[in-house]
A protein has these predicted regions:
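Substrate-binding groove/exosite segments of carbohydrate-active enzymes
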Residues: 2-42, 50-54
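Acidic/His metal-coordination segments adjacent to aromatic residues that form catalytic metal sites
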Residues: 4-24, 82-118
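Conserved aromatic-histidine-acidic binding/catalytic patches
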Residues: 14, 18-29, 45-48, 110-118, ...
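Generic structural signal for well-ordered, non-transmembrane alpha-helical segments
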Residues: 24-31, 54, 58-65, 116-124, ...
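Helix-loop segments that flank and shape redox-cofactor active sites
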Residues: 32-55, 124-141
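Hydrophobic stripe of amphipathic alpha-helices that form coiled-coil interfaces
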Residues: 44, 67, 74, 159-162, ...
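Conserved alpha-helical segments that form or flank metal/cofactor-binding pockets of metalloenzymes
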Residues: 51-92
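Preference for long, well-ordered alpha-helical segments
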Residues: 122-168
């Protein structure tokens, strides 16, 4: 009986503290995405967009929840479950700018900000983290991010389709 070789690499770019910070940052982004999309549902007049956003809000909340549950496993303590944090002041300001369009006539701007700017940025950061973190020691984070990435890709595709239809 031979055990197949594990071809993953030990050691990565991020130590436990760095990956915990990143997970806190990712949770912040998913929480804010959940809140701003949820808040927009009432202001968007197009019913198909409202119903699509409802599912995306739920999936973003699921992502925020699973990322939050990972934090105590990264030795952040029990209180870490309640903590999320912007990567920096610039990202917090960016989120506020994305959240800014509130009136019903700004559906295109709302969708473009989230699905053509924010979500693609998050996707790139999630994928880079998965590539550069320790493939063995941080396998649980990678596994969680694989699900978040899958959902994020689906969200981006939905947003592109909605924008194509709204801009025709």
């Amino acid at each position: 009986f031979e055990v197949p070789a594990d071809l993953r690499e030990l050691y990565g770019r991020y130590d436990v503290e760095a990956i915990a910070r990143r997970v806190r940052n990712f949770r912040y982004a998913e929480e804010w995405t959940t809140m701003l999309l949820g808040g927009w549902i009432a202001t968007i007049p197009e019913v198909p967009v409202k119903t699509g956003l409802g599912k995306i809000v739920w999936e973003c909340a699921q992502s925020a929840d699973v990322l939050g549950r990972r934090l105590p496993e990264l030795r952040c303590g029990r209180r870490a479950i309640e903590a999320s944090q912007a990567a920096n002041d610039g990202f917090a300001s960016f989120i506020q700018e994305v959240a800014d369009p509130e009136t019903p006539d700004l559906t295109i701007e709302k969708i473009a900000g989230v699905f053509e700017v924010l979500k693609p940025h998050l996707l790139a950061v999630y994928e880079r983290t998965m590539r550069e973190t320790d493939q063995i020691c941080d396998a649980p984070t990678i596994e969680l991010l694989e699900d978040v990435v899958r959902r994020t890709r689906k969200h981006i595709a939905w947003g592109e389709e909605v924008l194509d239809r709204l801009c025709d």
